Amino acid sequence: MYIQKIIRDNIKTALNEIFQFNTDNIELQQTKKEFEGDVTLVVFPLVKELKSSPKEISEKIGDYLVANSSVVSYNIVSGFLNLLIADEHYLSFFNSVKEDSEYGFFDTISNEAVMIEYSSPNTNKPLHLGHIRNNLLGYSMSEIYKAAGKKVYKTQIINDRGIHICKSMIAWIDYGNGETPASTNLKGDKFVGDYYIKFDQVYKKEVEELIKSGVTEEEAKQNAPILLRAKEMLIQWESGDKDVVELWKKMNGWVYEGFEETYKNLGVDFDSYYYESDTYLLGKEFIFSGLKSGVFYKKDDGSVWCNLTEDGLDEKIVLRADGTAVYMTQDIGTAVQRVKDCPDINTMVYTVGNEQDYHFKVLFLILKKLGFSWSENLFHLSYGMVDLPSGKMKSREGTVVDADDLMQEMTSTAKEISKSLGKLEGLSEDEKNNVYSTVGLGALKYYILKVDPKKRILFDPKESVDFQGNTASFIQYSYARIQSILNLSLIHI
């Protein structure tokens, strides 16, 4: 505490001037409720060194502090010196905090930086409620590290390749009729997400028709015509087919524009971006070097594995028999690439849902076995799912709660409640809209961040905007009431 630091320094000065004694062993604690005071000095550790009674030491230090510091009075209880701090000190402290725009921030304490990964969405649909929790956790961690004096790199890896984006592309080719986000007045990510939903609808219908024709359910799911076309498109993309790559770039571009709008509204940002299309081939060189050093081994079919059974984990494939990479290969390469890009990185934090807990245990252990010293400072910021009262979100069925829709709902809910309370008289429409946004998004952020990340959340929009209880709305309302009282008083703070 700030006050304890000041009192500690005052006590050290008192000991030096009264007893000619220097020490850093000064034990302070908050005064117990049953006694009068704000801060308590535990005197017993000083008795042996000063060769005086606890009462005599307490009186001399207490008298000195009353004469030379912000202490206005003291009392002694069985070797505990209880100190009462002057009200003027707190007023002075509050004023200094008000004038210090960076109160609570530390200067940069080292040249070692932290990289924090968060968001990392797929490019086939808009961000949803789960992404909101991810972004708020990752961004908050970044700001906390900054305040603690660390240099921070905020990054994400965008999952911009694979069968999921090909599904949206196939559906757009079949049913898009040349439409664009601009022509339909839709955000780009929402526009592309609608075609992902369309693909799933067509896919399910084709599966049903195949089953009716006598094909087994498993065969139908694997051989639905639209799915086979999406798989073929992925092969074309990987071979660099010009038309496929151009469409891929165009549709991903629409999605990125939509993402940026969502990030802006949520109040988060990034310093750098990594794309899976650039990183999915990274890591192979480390698999080959790991083979030579004995970290990995090759099975008869040619696939490469890491045996982690002695570490309490399972065997993990790191390269397929056909030589293609798996996600673990990519993550190994991406981690190394990030350190190359930012050599001052000492710590990396991955903000990813708890369904990936095992993946990160394996990743961190493999990087350690490969001999990367920075692997000791890798951390998985794991978090639980977010549900709404209506149930778990499912993007393929079009029942996902989009982040944009939820933020708009929060603003609308705040508007409804604020109007019912009748506290906005005299404000312009712009000022009212600013209040609605501040209250609504503040409620969303606080409701999510107040919960232990490891716990699953049942998010209730109306409950989060309640002006009673442990909510952002209550805190904001309390702040506004305090400001109103101060404005009506003669005290200037």
What is each model feature region?
Residues L50:
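Phosphate-backbone binding interfaces of nucleic-acid-interacting proteins
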Residues M1, I491-I493:
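Accessible peptide chain termini
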Residues N16, F21-L41, P45, S53-I491:
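NTP-dependent nucleotidyl-transfer catalytic core
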Residues M1-F21:
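Generic start-of-chain signal for non-secretory N-termini
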